[in-house]
Amino acid sequence: MRNNDAKRRSDLLRRRSAPLITPSELGAEASKDIAGGMNAVLTDVFALYMKTKNFHRHMSGPHFRDYHLLLDEQADQLYAMTDAIAERIRKTGGSTLRSIGHIARVQRVIDNDADYVEPLDMLAELREDNQNLTARLREVHEVVDEIRAIATASLIENWIDETERRTWFLFESSRRGD
């Protein structure tokens, strides 16, 4: 019985220490650069998703329905990005996020845990967060463009467009009529 337990433990330890490196023609240094930039973006996308869902759930006021639906749509779009980003990192030979703790340590999006936030303040805060995400995506695009990670650059271009659209909708939705 002891030998069987020792063998299982040995097998488990061996599997845990096995390298998780996907071969990539981009090379180890490029894979590291892609993973670094894309993981930073991924943490921000997860944090922005959570903030958007938080505001979606705690929306109140005369424009509740419109804002509630807008934020739900935007949160869905952000969540859809997460797996594509993580899989892109893995496809190019990198390692990606493993926990909520990892996200919390790296994210640059500032959480908002306030009990109440005015609806227009919610939209303004999300607009600013999306603008910052656009800037970060552009920074990573420069890196992947330089190392000719064409598929990664192409995905980032689409995400920039989606993020600019979210920013635009948040801006237009928060304008006050005269």
State each model region's role.
Residues 42, 49, 56, 75, ...:
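A structural signal for well-ordered alpha-helices, especially hydrophobic packing surfaces
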Residues 59, 63-102:
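Conserved alpha-helical segments that form or flank metal/cofactor-binding pockets of metalloenzymes
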Residues 19-41, 119:
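Disorder-to-helix initiation segments
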Residues 2-4, 64, 76, 96, ...:
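Long, contiguous binding/interaction regions
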Residues 1-23:
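Acidic, low-complexity proline/glycine-rich segments
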Residues 87, 101-158:
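Acidic/histidine-rich alpha-helical segments that form the ligand environment
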Residues 25-33, 48-73, 140-151:
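Helix-loop segments that flank and shape redox-cofactor active sites
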Residues 32-42, 46, 72-75, 79, ...:
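Short amphipathic alpha-helical segments with heptad-repeat character
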